[in-house]
Amino acid sequence: MYYKFIREEKIKMKRKEYTAVNFSNADFSKPLCGFTFTDCNFVNANMREAEIHGCEFIDCDMRGADLSLSIIKNTVFTSDVEYSLDLLGANIEYADIIDSKFRRCNMAGVNLRASRIYNTELYSVRLKDAKLTSARFVNSILEDSHYSGERDFVLVHTEWRD
């Protein structure tokens, strides 16, 4: 698979595991399937409309990354790094989001159907028209996060503070 960088460079992703690799400003236009990224830099990466399946993002810096309108399935985000990204309309079904912090993220129209969100903090997150059917928020905090939609999700030991 090739990924085009802003500087018109191309790299071929030959491995399935990457540690401490700088993908800042990268343009991910091809599907990502079965990759593990640990301590990688995705600052301002363009993942708009990306297809991400069966991947793990462990302690990656994703500030400013654009995942809007992406399809993200069976993917794990584990981090104590603060995310500030655009997830507008992203499809994040069946994902595991663990030990993460989302601040000032645009998650309007995001589809988190059947996703599991554990030990995660969402601050000032815009969840307008988000689809949370069967999503499970466990030991999480949602603060100043605005949601409009049906309450057909599960909150377990989770605080929702407006």
PLM features: what roles do these ranges have?
Residues 2-162:
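Tandem repeat scaffolds
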